[in-house]
């Protein structure tokens, strides 16, 4: 079963911006309680959406470049990219159903 991929500042452009499939980037930190709450949800969804959508994780403690460039001020923040452009953003922990709804909308975009 697919899992979220780890992304660092050094490979963000390659793994996220140049991806052929939409990418949901989870900006998180190990000390963040809500981040730990949504981690198993994102693990599950990574498997269910494998091949159609990629879920990536960026540890903001270790990778500040893109978090800063994208104006990430609170975590968890999920930023959704399609064709190298930001098409959506969610700040804070949300229920699994909301993630599914948003991921499905992104996949339905032309």
Swiss-Prot record:
It comes from the Bacteria. Gene3D superfamilies: Glutaredoxin. Coiled coil: none annotated. Residues 3-108 form the Thioredoxin domain. The modification N6-methyllysine is found at residue 105. GO terms for cellular component: cytoplasm; cytosol. CDD domains: TRX_family. GO terms for biological process: cell redox homeostasis. Keywords: Disulfide bond, Electron transport, Methylation, Redox-active center, Transport. InterPro entries: Thioredoxin (IPR005746), Thioredoxin-like_sf (IPR036249), Thioredoxin_CS (IPR017937), Thioredoxin_domain (IPR013766). The keyword Disulfide bond applies. The modification N6,N6-dimethyllysine is found at residue 105. One of its GO terms (molecular function) is protein-disulfide reductase activity. Disulfide bonds join 32-35. Belongs to the thioredoxin family. NCBIfam families: thioredoxin. Participates in various redox reactions through the reversible oxidation of its active center dithiol to a disulfide and catalyzes dithiol-disulfide exchange reactions. This is Thioredoxin. It comes from Chloroflexus aurantiacus (strain ATCC 29366 / DSM 635 / J-10-fl).
């Amino acid at each position: 079963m697919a899992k979220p991929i780890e992304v660092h500042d050094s490979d963000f452009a390659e793994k996220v911006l140049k991806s052929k499939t939409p990418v949901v980037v989870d900006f998180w930190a190990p000390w963040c309680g809500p981040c730990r709450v949504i981690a198993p949800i994102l693990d599950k969804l990574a498997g269910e959406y494998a091949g159609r959508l990629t879920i990536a994780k960026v540890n903001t403690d270790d990778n500040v470049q893109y978090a800063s460039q994208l104006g990430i001020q609170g975590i968890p923040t999920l930023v959704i990219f399609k064709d190298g452009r930001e098409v959506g953003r969610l700040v804070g922990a949300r229920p699994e159903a909301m993630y599914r709804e948003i991921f499905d909308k992104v996949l339905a975009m032309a």
